[in-house]
């Protein structure tokens, strides 16, 4: 593990994230919600932005691209869906493509559902995944453009990652996600422990990410929609994972 990663707040509840390669001084931003906090974080570290790795086209993930590209002349990497309204793109990528940030290698996973163009970036050597608005800590993104089965398939791709991978997501939603998850699995010991940890972190005004994929596999009801205990929690014993996931997402939308 050689990369340096910095996490900070953008907008209201978006996360800004930088991943830096000490060997080459290359630095990538994962999305660009707004330019100001990203520039401030770069200045604090003495880093120069070389890349922006875009996950999807929503405005709260691309709003800072134009200013950052003008200032740093950085490369913009984005999903291959050219219909998505992302400007200033230098490289378009899809499933299985490798993106280099200096000597760091990021593998692209197509994770549609929240949007049709959504991708995640997996840095296997660093044991880290940047999943943006597909997988949150103890939650997942709203299914806006895709379908519930599509989103479920995307979550399964992420669930296949090893337990010791760190998850970075796009928003600080963990407290509300925990509150909802406890309505489904009030007796899940891992979830209750996570709830206590989240309450402590938020009381100290600290972020609840990164988290570990192994912890998500124990406590995230959306990631475990094919677990009989989760199905029972929404009165859908014997239903498919995709169907249980759809019910979970509908309930969360209304919560």
Curated annotation (Swiss-Prot):
Family the UniProt entry places it in: Belongs to the metallo-beta-lactamase superfamily. Glyoxalase II family.
Its job: Thiolesterase that catalyzes the hydrolysis of S-D-lactoyl-glutathione to form glutathione and D-lactic acid.
GO annotation, biological process: methylglyoxal catabolic process to D-lactate via S-lactoyl-glutathione
InterPro entries found in the cross-reference section: Clx_II_MBL, Glyoxalase_II_hydrolase, HAGH_C, Hydroxyacylglutathione_Hdrlase, Metallo-B-lactamas, RibonucZ/Hydroxyglut_hydro
Cofactors (names): Zn(2+)
Reactions mediated catalytically: an S-(2-hydroxyacyl)glutathione + H2O = a 2-hydroxy carboxylate + glutathione + H(+)
Group of enzyme by EC: hydrolase
Co-factor remark: Binds 2 Zn(2+) ions per subunit.
Keyword flag Membrane: no
Assembly behavior: Monomer.
Annotated residues for binding of Zn(2+) 2: 60-61, 133, 171
Name of the protein in question: Hydroxyacylglutathione hydrolase
SMART domains: Lactamase_B
Pfam families assigned: HAGH_C, Lactamase_B
Pathway: Secondary metabolite metabolism; methylglyoxal degradation; (R)-lactate from methylglyoxal: step 2/2
Keyword set, alphabetical order: Hydrolase, Metal-binding, Zinc
GO molecular function, one term: metal ion binding
HAMAP family: Glyoxalase_2
Enzyme Commission (EC) number: 3.1.2.6
Organism superkingdom: Bacteria
Upper lineage: Bacteria, Pseudomonadati, Pseudomonadota, Alphaproteobacteria, Hyphomicrobiales
């Amino acid at each position: 593990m050689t990369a340096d990663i910095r996490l900070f707040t953008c907008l209201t509840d978006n996360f800004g994230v930088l991943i830096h390669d000490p060997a080459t001084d290359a630095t990538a931003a994962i999305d660009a919600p707004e330019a100001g906090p990203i520039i401030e974080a770069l200045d604090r570290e003495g880093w120069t932005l070389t890349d922006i790795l875009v996950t999807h086209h929503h405005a709260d993930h691309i709003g800072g691209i134009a200013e950052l590209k003008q200032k740093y002349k950085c490369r913009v990497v984005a999903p291959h869906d050219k219909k998505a309204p992302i400007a200033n793109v230098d490289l378009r990528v899809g499933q299985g493509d490798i993106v280099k940030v200096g000597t760091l290698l990021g593998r692209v996973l197509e994770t549609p559902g929240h949007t049709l163009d959504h991708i995640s970036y997996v840095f296997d050597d660093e044991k880290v995944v940047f999943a943006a608005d597909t997988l949150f800590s103890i939650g997942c993104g709203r299914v806006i453009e895709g379908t519930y089965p599509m989103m479920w398939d995307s979550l399964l791709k992420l669930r296949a990652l090893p337990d010791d991978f760190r998850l970075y997501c796009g928003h600080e939603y963990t407290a509300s996600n925990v509150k909802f998850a406890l309505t489904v699995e009030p007796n899940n010991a891992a979830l209750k422990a996570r709830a206590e940890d989240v309450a402590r972190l938020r009381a100290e005004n600290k972020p609840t990410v990164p988290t570990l994929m192994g912890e998500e596999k124990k406590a995230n009801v959306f990631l475990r929609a094919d677990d009989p205990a989760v199905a029972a929690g929404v009165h859908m014993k014997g239903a498919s994972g995709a169907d249980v996931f759809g019910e979970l997402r509908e309930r969360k939308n209304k919560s």
